[in-house]
Amino acid sequence: MEPIKITKGDFLKNAGIVGMYNMLHVLKAREGEDFWTDEEEQVLCISREFALNADWTDMYFKAFVEIYGPMCTYQEIINRIEKCKGVIEKGDGKEKKSSIKDDLKYITDKMSSSSYKSGFANIRDKIENPEIYENIKSRKINVKMESDEILKRLSELENFLKQPLCRETFCMKSIIYNYINCFWNGKSFLHKANATEDMREMFEKDFSKPLKDYLLKSHEKSMGYCIECNALIDDGSRSNEKVPISFMNDMADDLDKKSSAFWNCKVDAYICPLCAYLYALVPLGFRLVGNKFVFQNIDCSLNALINSNETGKVVLEENARHSEEKYATWVARTLNTVFKLKIRELNNIPVILRGTNEKDGYTFNILHKDILNILKDKKIMEYLEKLSKDPNVKIKNDFLNVYESSIENLINYNNQYRLINRLIKASIETESILSRAVLVFKMQVRTFIIMRGKGENTEMNVKSMANSGYKLRKAILAAKGVEPDADECMRGTIYRLTNALSVGNTERFMDMIIRLYTSSRLDVPNGFIDMLQDREKFNQYGYAFILGLKGSHYVSKEENENG
């Protein structure tokens, strides 16, 4: 049988295609047999036999629970139950019991919420021990109870919640109102009139059954067209193949209520059931990063599109690690995946973002080609990789993620000098921070070389200035009779030099440099003359010199030995 072919389209359809792939991948459909991409990597193909025999409702629900389940209220309830049980099992002290007071309140409050009540009502006759849930409502678990009773009630509740139908129902209640409704609304289980209805039945009626019926039917005599994929659809007044696109947030008004925008007030902007199902999968195509959903619309090939937005793998295996990930970090991490595909010509990449509130709209960013060229540079990738292994530094009472800050500067076309300045000042008190300052400085110099195409001379001059700073350091410390790694006597000098650099005060900076060289009897390097006429050189040479003066060679011994 001819396979079902899904071609790329706008960003929403592309997100739906990624969502389809993620769903099939997570549920372990057979890639290469049940679904595949064509040789040109432009079309997602699905076996018609697989599609006609598949339970599209079951797949939809299971995929959402697997991918978004770890981030749901349900999982937090399970985590808190296990925490409370652990505290009680260790001993029955008042202090220990009081430490779980807030956790017990969280558990009972969430279990008594309106969404959980309506979900329970739909599955009450299909699960075991429904009285356990009803007991939560009538007699809440609290710290005033005996420890044995708390432990017994929590164990019963945990076993109750771990029933597959309970897990699915309670997870989906959270997923629907926290994730899915950010993208579509007013249809199926998100229609107000269906709030208390069985979620699976509503989805089957509005999405899965129309899809199956559509795939089974011949459309040789159909007269209507899907506005998304141009496929033929029945356009009769009673046809269930005409799906208004208005259920997608921010895409169109309700076409049944507002037809004045169409010729002769005849609405003809409908999508087919297959595209409607793809749109329902859009939340699986976007990736939740911090407090935003993000999607990279790389449409040069399906492999690039799928790999850069592969939600299932990341969330299932690394959810805890990436739950608070920032946008800039996500960009760098996903682009690394794209660069590994070795796409011959990678142009500007549109990135679509949407907030996690229902009323938030779509915003569009562009990762321009010049930024992509920087991020895929081997040396830049090497510096970022090193920063990612130990990204956080403590500066006074605050923590700074150097890795995220440096990427954010790159994608926003900001230089790194403010960050370098902050790190050098912090390294005066905490020596270990200096290595991060060196990496960020190397990244700034490399970025300049890539953007301006000035390679060998720039790098050579910067190394020379760093070595000059290091030689001056050795001379000053030797004159004072101080050990090479003990530089307390230089802290004030380094602090004043970084201040002068940060405000671009060349006169003050050079005054301090001349004083230092006069007292050390060393010759002032020629680089200081060059930097007076060029603001970029002032920063490059100035920070290279200070890093050398601080005791960190811009070039490590290993690099020198390797030529």
Which residues does each PLM region occupy?
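Generic detector of bulky aromatic hydrophobic side chains
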Residues: 127-128, 206-207, 279, 432, ...
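Basic, glycine-/proline-tolerant helical and adjacent loop/strand elements
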Residues: 158-324
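Conserved small-residue
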Residues: 1-198, 364-376, 530-561
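Sequence-level detector for tyrosine residue identity
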Residues: 21, 60, 68, 74, ...
